[in-house]
Amino acid sequence: MRQTSWYVITGAPCSGKTSVICELERRGFRVVHEVARACIDRDLKNGKTRESIKADVPAFERRILHEKIRVESLLPDRETIFLDRAVPDSIAYYQIEGLPLDDPIEKSGAVCYKKIFFFERLPFEKDTVRTENTDFAARIDRELKNSYRRIGYSLTSVPVLPVRDRTDFILEHL
């Protein structure tokens, strides 16, 4: 298992993860932006529709899992890095979609993250990439917590606060 100095920022869609990742980046920290969002944005720019991107859910989830693995494989172990989601998030998404959990659970065992910061939910807002609804957000919130705990992580809960305060909270709890 790879021992790393990486911190995972996770939580349901629309919980403020990306805003805090951007604030950490603004403060000079190395970050990895959400892989799924980057893949979807790239596909949209190449002319695909949201519907066509997610039409084959198993293929989409496998693509995201393997892209997360690829991105993480390129990161230096000993550098402090903040990740907007990580490989274990795929366990929750596979669970919700009724897909076999063997692959994401096995792949999640390859890396040991320094700490998992779990963001409490904010009011839900849709955007061009986020197509889920409030019910899905509540369900994925539960599944994400279960997924990280299932593979042995404890979660540091990040309360609902303004972006700068949430960022300070994380930095105070490294």
Regions found by a protein language model. Name each.
Residues 9:
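Hydrophobic anchor at the beta1->P-loop junction of P-loop NTPases
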Residues 13:
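The conserved Walker
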Residues 16:
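Conserved glycine(s) of the Walker
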Residues 22-67:
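Conserved substrate/cofactor phosphate-moiety recognition/catalytic segment
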